[in-house]
Amino acid sequence: MAKSISKIGSRKNARIGSRKQTRKIPKGVIYVQASFNNTIVTVTDVRGRVISWSSAGSCGFKGTRRGTPFAAQTAAANAIRTVVDQGMQRAEVIIKGPGLGRDAALRAIRRSGILLRFIRDVTPMPHNGCRAPKKRRV
């Protein structure tokens, strides 16, 4: 029978002080995807790695309230709060989609104090492609 030798003070797989470093991100790209049902705001660095994201649904809005301008404003403020703390000063904004939250999200981004290099609208527009959904009758 083998005798076990206990080492005093030994730590296996110990990770002392290996917390992930919060790096400074001076500039980035803010993507706003505004559909009729929800608004998703994603903040990336220049290389495209996601730093922060938020959506109206993740901010606590459920159902039809997710598509409102106020929900989009809350989602944008939520996503940007973390990157402002990491030192983001300049950003490019890329907006996609026809939703109601486009302008509200852009207003929240402008209010955050980040300098905007440009605002680009990349909403896909069909050149008479697929048939559009029928109009609602309420």
Swiss-Prot record:
Keywords in alphabetical order: Chloroplast, Plastid, Ribonucleoprotein, Ribosomal protein, RNA-binding, rRNA-binding
Classification via InterPro entries: Ribosomal_uS11, Ribosomal_uS11_bac-type, Ribosomal_uS11_CS, Ribosomal_uS11_sf
Coiled-coil features, chain-numbered ranges: none
Subcellular location: Plastid, Chloroplast
GO molecular function: rRNA binding; structural constituent of ribosome
A single Gene Ontology CC term: chloroplast
GO biological process terms on file: translation
One Pfam family it belongs to: Ribosomal_S11
Biased amino acid composition, Basic residues: 9-21
Superkingdom: Eukaryota
Region (Disordered): 1-21
SUPFAM superfamilies xrefs: Translational machinery components (SSF53137)
Quaternary context: Part of the 30S ribosomal subunit.
NCBIfam families according to UniProt: PRK05309.1 (NF003698), uS11_bact (TIGR03632)
Family to which the UniProt record says this protein belongs: Belongs to the universal ribosomal protein uS11 family.
Name used for this protein in its record: Small ribosomal subunit protein uS11c
Taxonomic source organism: Cicer arietinum (Chickpea)
Gene: rps11
